[in-house]
């Protein structure tokens, strides 16, 4: 007896780890947020540019963890010409390639902004995704401290444009030269210690997440996390670890009455590391930057020097900065959430120079759009309600052309509208359920009787949803029920829909 053919197995629909789907409400919120950021960046004179998601791997450089495989830390593949290409892990390295390739045609300094998705081939976890959105601005071709100061000021202005009040954010400023000076002083300067220094910097960069004890472990032999995974440390000796921790413990703010950046920098110069020329040069850079920001009206409540700011990427060469949210809020389950850093950047004078073989100074700032959006949504600065859907024109019978004409008329008037394209035999109730799921403000109804009379029925779906709460108040219920559906002549349809949308505060962004 012949075997029955096996039924083909259904493919399992599943989302890859570390990635997320996004619906209309979240996309609309992103659009609103990006527009506010764009307005600030353009006010500062930056212009847009786009680069592709893929770059040659060697163009991106090994600025994420240096591993044996070229696709460690980034998503990479070999092209048909056997060259490695990778998905960008940030928006800065691709910009460096773009500027180098178009150097002679671009104005210098070159001021640009761009936003888009970036990708990290890292272990995903709560709040850590493999794909996320960034919004960057960069000035290439200027080594002036004013360019770095401008990034800090623009970061502060952007936070306020997004509805985050002063006192609820802080732009923190440091200098890689200060950290490099400390590392030189403890004996790990020079090219032969590049990898070890990078491990130290990345350990310090995790201070807000792991605390001093976790950083100490990463400065030493290493640290095992809650899942049991072991991260190899920098292998510093006890004395070297003590010196690094001394710097991190020295905030310089505890006994300062006026909260002065100048006073803090004076205190830093009192540390024994100040005899190091690199350390001293870093202090002088910060003095110039803070002089500019303070003269422009940005006090220490908005921009403040902080020696714990590192930035984890290797390519930074000078001033570095981060934007921290000082908001304590709760997630949807009532658990406390502290968002910390939502953006940062710094000076990267060597990134474009790799392609040019000549010095090309550059500085930039990046906002983590995905992370900041989550924070703004939780504090109520970004709506998470779905945007109003289109006006739905319902259908009766097989004649579609007349209904489609109504849709076209609404669209020509600038009203979002769609024809119900489900089963034409569906009842009016089924079509209304569809309109509700689409979050439609109203629906247009025209059966055979209405068609003969040259009228349409307009059903106010927003008011209809409110009627459910009025069932106990019969008089009010009957009054609003009469308002929830009304008729008008066909040639009055557009005007009546516009009145309803205005009355209900419906505006499509």
Swiss-Prot record:
Compartments, record wording: Cytoplasm
BP terms from Gene Ontology: histidyl-tRNA aminoacylation
EC numbers for this chain: 6.1.1.21
A GO CC term assigned to this protein in UniProt: cytoplasm
Cysteine pairs bridged by disulfides in the record: none
Cross-referenced InterPro entries: aa-tRNA-synth_II, aa-tRNA-synth_II/BPL/LPL, Anticodon-bd, Anticodon-bd_dom_sf, His-tRNA-ligase, HisRS-like_core, HisRS/HisZ
Reaction(s) catalysed (UniProt annotation): tRNA(His) + L-histidine + ATP = L-histidyl-tRNA(His) + AMP + diphosphate + H(+)
Enzyme class: ligase
Entry keyword annotation includes Protein biosynthesis: yes
ATP-binding among keywords: yes
Subunit description: Homodimer.
Official protein name in the record: Histidine--tRNA ligase
Lineage: Bacteria, Pseudomonadati, Pseudomonadota, Alphaproteobacteria, Hyphomicrobiales
């Amino acid at each position: 007896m012949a075997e029955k053919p096996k039924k083909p197995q259904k493919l399992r629909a599943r989302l890859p780890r570390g990635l997320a789907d996004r619906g209309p409400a979240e996309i609309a919120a992103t659009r609103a947020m990006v527009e506010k950021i764009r307005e600030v960046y353009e006010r500062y004179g930056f212009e847009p540019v786009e680069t592709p998601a893929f770059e040659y791997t060697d163009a991106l450089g090994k600025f994420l963890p240096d591993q044996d495989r070229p696709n460690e830390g980034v998503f990479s593949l070999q092209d048909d010409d056997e060259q490695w290409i990778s998905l960008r892990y940030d928006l800065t390295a691709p910009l460096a390639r773009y500027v180098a390739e178009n150097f002679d045609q671009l104005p210098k300094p070159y001021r640009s902004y761009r936003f888009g998705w970036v990708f990290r081939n890292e272990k995903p976890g709560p709040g850590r995704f493999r794909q996320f959105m960034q919004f960057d601005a960069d000035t290439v071709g200027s080594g002036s401290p004013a360019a770095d100061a401008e990034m800090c000021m623009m970061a502060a202005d952007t936070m306020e444009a997004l509805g985050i009040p002063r006192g609820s954010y802080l732009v923190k400023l440091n200098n890689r030269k200060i950290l490099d000076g400390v590392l030189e002083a403890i004996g790990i300067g020079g090219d032969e210690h590049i990898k070890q220094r990078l491990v130290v910097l990345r350990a310090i960069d995790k201070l807000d997440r792991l605390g001093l004890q976790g950083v100490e472990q990463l400065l030493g032999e290493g640290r095992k996390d809650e899942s049991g995974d072991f991260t190899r440390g920098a292998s510093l000796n006890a004395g070297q670890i003590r010196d690094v921790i001394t710097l991190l413990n020295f905030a310089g703010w505890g006994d300062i009455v006026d909260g002065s950046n100048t006073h803090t920098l004076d205190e830093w110069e009192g540390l024994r590391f100040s005899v190091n020329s690199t350390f001293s040069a870093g202090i002088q850079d910060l003095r110039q930057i803070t002089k500019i920001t303070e003269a422009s009206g940005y006090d220490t409540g908005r921009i403040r020097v902080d020696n714990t700011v590192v930035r984890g990427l290797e390519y930074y060469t000078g001033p570095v900065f981060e934007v921290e949210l000082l908001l304590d809020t709760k997630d949807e389950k009532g658990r406390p959430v502290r968002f910390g850093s939502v953006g940062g950047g710094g000076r990267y004078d060597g990134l474009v120079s790799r392609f040019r073989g000549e010095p090309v100074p550059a500085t930039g700032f990046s906002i983590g759009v995905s992370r900041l959006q989550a924070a703004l949504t939780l504090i109520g600065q970004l709506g998470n309600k779905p945007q109003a859907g289109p006006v739905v024109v319902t259908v009766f019978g097989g004649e579609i052309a007349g209904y489609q004409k109504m849709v076209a008329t609404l669209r020509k008037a600038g009203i979002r509208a769609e024809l119900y394209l489900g089963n034409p035999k569906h009842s009016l109730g089924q079509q209304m359920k569809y309109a509700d799921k689409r979050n439609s403000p109203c629906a247009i109804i025209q059966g055979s009787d209405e068609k003969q009379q040259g009228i349409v029925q307009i059903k106010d779906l927003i008011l209809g949803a409110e009627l459910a709460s009025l069932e106990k108040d019969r008089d009010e219920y009957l009054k609003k029920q009469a308002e929830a559906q009304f008729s008008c002549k066909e040639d009055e349809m557009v005007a009546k829909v516009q009145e309803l949308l205005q009355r209900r505060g419906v505006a499509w962004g």
